[in-house]
């Protein structure tokens, strides 16, 4: 396994797919990185030379990846919660943030149903 940006990427897959194992890199970004490094997308990771791996690492140095990116997103969410914005309140309450309906769905965000017992008449 080749180690790029602190992540072991699979050797038997194509380079484009392997790079997506790094948090913060999708398929489009992987294609752009390989184009800038001058490496074919169809190459397998096991066939890459050390020079090519170093070119990829140099390209990825300009991106915010893995721990830094995770930290930035969590700090952004924390900031929203501290300033008391609508989005921050939704995060704090564990509800959908982007305006989705919560009357029937949103079970992923709300967790399992908490049934309330009926009053006897």
UniProtKB/Swiss-Prot annotation:
<dbReference type="GO" id="GO:0006412">
    <property type="term" value="P:translation"/>
</dbReference>
<dbReference type="GO" id="GO:0019843">
    <property type="term" value="F:rRNA binding"/>
</dbReference>
<dbReference type="GO" id="GO:0005829">
    <property type="term" value="C:cytosol"/>
</dbReference>
<dbReference type="InterPro" id="IPR001892">
    <property type="entry name" value="Ribosomal_uS13"/>
</dbReference>
<comment type="subunit">
    <text>Part of the 30S ribosomal subunit. Forms a loose heterodimer with protein S19. Forms two bridges to the 50S subunit in the 70S ribosome.</text>
</comment>
<dbReference type="GO" id="GO:0000049">
    <property type="term" value="F:tRNA binding"/>
</dbReference>
<dbReference type="GO" id="GO:0015935">
    <property type="term" value="C:small ribosomal subunit"/>
</dbReference>
<dbReference type="InterPro" id="IPR010979">
    <property type="entry name" value="Ribosomal_uS13-like_H2TH"/>
</dbReference>
<feature type="region of interest" description="Disordered">
    <location>
        <begin position="91"/>
        <end position="121"/>
    </location>
</feature>
<dbReference type="Pfam" id="PF00416">
    <property type="entry name" value="Ribosomal_S13"/>
</dbReference>
<comment type="similarity">
    <text>Belongs to the universal ribosomal protein uS13 family.</text>
</comment>
<dbReference type="InterPro" id="IPR018269">
    <property type="entry name" value="Ribosomal_uS13_CS"/>
</dbReference>
<keyword id="KW-0699">rRNA-binding</keyword>
<keyword id="KW-0694">RNA-binding</keyword>
<keyword id="KW-0820">tRNA-binding</keyword>
<comment type="function">
    <text>Located at the top of the head of the 30S subunit, it contacts several helices of the 16S rRNA. In the 70S ribosome it contacts the 23S rRNA (bridge B1a) and protein L5 of the 50S subunit (bridge B1b), connecting the 2 subunits; these bridges are implicated in subunit movement. Contacts the tRNAs in the A and P-sites.</text>
</comment>
<dbReference type="InterPro" id="IPR027437">
    <property type="entry name" value="Rbsml_uS13_C"/>
</dbReference>
<feature type="compositionally biased region" description="Basic residues">
    <location>
        <begin position="106"/>
        <end position="121"/>
    </location>
</feature>
<dbReference type="InterPro" id="IPR019980">
    <property type="entry name" value="Ribosomal_uS13_bac-type"/>
</dbReference>
<keyword id="KW-0689">Ribosomal protein</keyword>
<dbReference type="GO" id="GO:0003735">
    <property type="term" value="F:structural constituent of ribosome"/>
</dbReference>
<protein>
    <recommendedName>
        <fullName>Small ribosomal subunit protein uS13</fullName>
    </recommendedName>
</protein>
<keyword id="KW-0687">Ribonucleoprotein</keyword>
